Amino acid sequence: MKNQSNLPLYQLFVHPKDLRELKKDIWDDDPVPAVMKVNQKRLDIDIAYRGSHIRDFKKKSYHISFYQPKTFRGAREIHLNAEYKDPSLMRNKLSLDFFSELGTLSPKAEFAFVKMNGKNEGVYLELESVDEYYLAKRKLADGAIFYAVDDDANFSLMSDLERETKTSLELGYEKKTGTEEDDFYLQDMIFKINTVPKAQFKSEVTKHVDVDKYLRWLAGIVFTSNYDGFVHNYALYRSGETGLFEVIPWDYDATWGRDIHGERMAADYVRIQGFNTLTARILDESEFRKSYKRLLEKTLQSLFTIEYMEPKIMAMYERIRPFVLMDPYKKNDIERFDREPDVICEYIKNRSQYLKDHLSIL
């Protein structure tokens, strides 16, 4: 079949007893043992379901940890995302690649075709785990990584979930790697960015946050319209070298004109200034606001254009289409899949116009 060798094949083998255990409680994070074969290489792994609301979907997403050998291609674990609610299957990868081009740290995302016990499971997006191996691959300084796990990761002293003052400044975060001292640095950063008076904010924030990287991340959210991106769907990395925090995007399927349910989303849904306490305070400083505006203007003329994005979208679409036809959960929806490149391009056109029309308010 044409393009047959164009996606890597991941064959998963799970003992029926373990598969039954896995399916018994989809909310259980405990993994079961399994085997993964890639290019004749046999890997002993632990496998579990991943995600929150996505666990309810027919096509499951998986978290895979390598057991024997302990690492594979320089990683200790990977995520296999079903991208079930995205009719294009491409939005997450498009977004993460876009962030990377904007100059933001971003996980690598590559398509693979997955089989389980000989049965086609379909097209998946393999997502690199953001951990110490991620840092090592990029020759980045050792440091702490915190995952933003819910809406309390809002850079505020107030809880989004409880609508009252947070009982702990670490609420909303889960430490992936780092020390107890790093917990203090996270709390210190959140406390300072919320309590420092305006007159001292500019000099104080630059002691805690890489503002240039933060503005690039903010621009990435605003271009892709990830409504959830301001308060979760990210990881924080504190460089042991600079002592500064930067933000790494995560889970960007609800973007490029569709929401988390896969429904069409208006191009003006996410405002140009973004959201969250830190964003508001940073953009309140004229120097930072001007930098952000210049970044948007430059990107609107380069990366975020139909001329630049359409060839990428079409190459991705053509690469995975033969495999979508073999995906048991997606093959009957192929007509919708075929319309998606146009939907994404229409979003770029409309979003670009919205942003150009609103640059003047920055």
Curated annotation (Swiss-Prot):
Pfam family, one: CotH
GO BP annotation list: sporulation resulting in formation of a cellular spore
Keywords attached to this entry: Sporulation
Stored InterPro entries: Spore_coat_CotH_CotH2/3/7
Entry's induction text: Expression is negatively regulated by the transcriptional regulator GerE.
Tagged with keyword Iron: no
Cellular compartment(s): Spore coat
Assembly and binders: Assembly of CotH requires CotE and GerE.
Biological role: Involved in the assembly of several proteins in the inner and outer layer of the spore coat. Stabilizes CotC and CotU in the mother cell compartment of sporulating cells and promotes the assembly of both early and late forms of CotC-related polypeptides on the spore surface.
PANTHER family membership: INNER SPORE COAT PROTEIN H (PTHR40050:SF1)
Homology family: Belongs to the CotH family.
Protein name (Swiss-Prot/TrEMBL): Inner spore coat protein H
The species this protein was found in: Bacillus subtilis (strain 168)
Gene transcribed to yield this protein: cotH
